[in-house]
Amino acid sequence: MSTSITVRNRDRSLPPLLLPNVSLLEKDIRRKGTQNVGITDPELLSTTWTRKRAFPTDELLGGYKRLKPAAADSNECAIGIATVTPPPTLPVSAIVPPPQNYTPPLFEYHPHALASMVNEDANASCTQMSIISRSTSNSTTSSATSTSSISKRQRSGPSCDKCRLKKIKCNAKIEILLQDDTIMPMISNKLRYVLTPDDIRLYRGTLLRNIAIPDDVIEGTGSRKLIKHIDKLVLLTPCLPCIKKKHSSSSTNFPKNDKCTFSKGFTRADINISSKISLKFKDKTIYDITYDDYKSIDF
């Protein structure tokens, strides 16, 4: 256990803040004895202590440690080993007070508010991402649903009689070239009439003047037909099953030359009219109904 040793400088010939060099004191003790030395403490006068407690010059110069100041004596003031000069301070008169109207700025730091703002930004971004992902999934689901519904549905309009009977998809193409009530009594008295090449040449300068009709229809060499149905002229392209004759010819209610037939009409309005006609004229088909029969029905 180390003990502190109080060192007092009683040699008045030395400067007040300097201590005697211990190594020099040891040489003087060997040469002259214990006289003429400014150390009066018996412990310091012993040669054994100086040998044991003497510090090398390198240690004194390199790793210098400040000793504790000696305690105050009853008769004289203790002289400290070292004193620290405090930094100069401004006089009281040099401090200028702030003006009366001066208001210091307030800088308030609210960690909870900052955390809440960060949380709100994170929640907003998460909400936006969830909305985007939800809208994307909804659009994907709706597109998939619409695609599946379109693929499952046979066609946008009615199917031909044979495809409806076989419950297969009908790819017949229906083009309405002209629709007007004035054409109902024209060309033929029948509500359903298939125009021949002679009929097309006859009405090409009047009724069919502004209608583009394909050459194969005019010449009668193709499978497409120009049909008058109630108040419209329809260009019908037969479906592929009817063209390939994959259906059986068990049905004898329709003419043999009309392979792809639409007995109930080509539009949904035609189906409504056909259902009313069939209720009143049960023994007639759409090919037998005349314009007079049509006028006798109250639509």
From Swiss-Prot:
Q: Which GO terms describe its biological process?
A: cellular response to starvation; negative regulation of filamentous growth of a population of unicellular organisms; negative regulation of transcription by RNA polymerase II; positive regulation of induction of conjugation with cellular fusion; positive regulation of sterol import; positive regulation of transcription by RNA polymerase II
Keyword match Isomerase: no
Q: What if the gene is knocked out?
A: Leads to increased expression of NCE102 and PRR2, when SUT2 is also deleted.
Stretches of Low complexity bias are at 133-151
As one GO molecular function, the record gives: DNA-binding transcription factor activity, RNA polymerase II-specific
Quaternary structure and partners: Interacts with SSN6/CYC8.
- Family as reported in the entry's similarity comment: Belongs to the SUT1 family.
User: Any additional notes?
Assistant: Present with 1100 molecules/cell in log phase SD medium.
What protein am I looking at? Sterol uptake protein 1
Q: List the source organism.
A: Saccharomyces cerevisiae (strain ATCC 204508 / S288c) (Baker's yeast)
Q: Which gene encodes it?
A: SUT1
